[in-house]
């Protein structure tokens, strides 16, 4: 029997959420991530901002670590592979590295529009039960669960004494799952919890399922 670590959670039959911001299907052997925004620091430097050159290395190392650990047949990148065209060469190099160990499936996001002629993208990808797309465009209703990115969900916990910690979150709703942003530069958008949302707060060392919002009494 598979033993879960503190940074893993079973969020559905055969599906693991990893606190390093990835989703893995154990029997179908796909690993999904979203919103890498690869090359964000290059984009900011080109615009004159003095930001450290550590984001791309962090993304690459974490991806390769996840792929080595889970051994997926396919790595599904759910849009916004790059932040803009500044890092297209570096992004292509990353994909070549990944192709040595699995099949990258790169779904197009809104930030990818300027590099679609230089990197191969899909508008969406499907399995029997899941429909993967970025989430920035409306799609036709389907009996498959949608798995999307784009929204950069985050959640906040506090100790009751004034300390508050905001972390990336994975959100499950009926018919739609929203991935946290994989980019270390993504601050995340506080997710407005409701009765329909199951929210998992993600850190590299631990995953916490937040209490579900209670219905408002009349």
Question: Language-model segments: what does each one mean?
Answer:
Residues 1-78, 82-218:
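Extended recognition/assembly regions associated with phosphoester-bond processing machinery
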């Amino acid at each position: 029997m598979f033993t879960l670590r503190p940074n893993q959670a079973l969020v559905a039959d055969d599906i693991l959420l990893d606190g390093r911001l990835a989703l893995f299907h154990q029997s179908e052997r796909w690993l999904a991530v979203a919103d890498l925004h690869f090359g964000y620091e290059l984009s900011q430097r080109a615009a004159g901002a003095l930001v450290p050159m550590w984001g791309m290395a962090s993304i690459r190392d974490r991806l390769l670590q996840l792929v080595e650990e889970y051994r997926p047949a396919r790595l599904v990148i759910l849009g916004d592979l790059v932040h803009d065209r500044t890092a297209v060469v570096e992004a292509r190099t990353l994909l070549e590295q990944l192709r040595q160990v699995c099949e990258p499936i790169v779904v197009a996001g809104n930030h990818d529009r300027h590099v679609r002629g230089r990197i191969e993208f899909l508008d969406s990808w499907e399995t029997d039960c899941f429909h993967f797309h970025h989430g920035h465009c409306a799609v036709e209703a389907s009996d498959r669960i949608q798995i999307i990115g784009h929204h950069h969900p985050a959640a906040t916990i506090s100790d009751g004494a004034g300390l508050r910690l905001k972390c990336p979150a994975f959100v499950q709703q009926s018919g739609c799952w929203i991935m946290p942003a994989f980019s270390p530069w993504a601050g995340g958008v506080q997710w407005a919890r409701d009765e329909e949302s199951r929210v998992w707060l993600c850190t590299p060392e631990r995953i916490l399922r937040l209490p579900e919002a209670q219905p408002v009494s009349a």
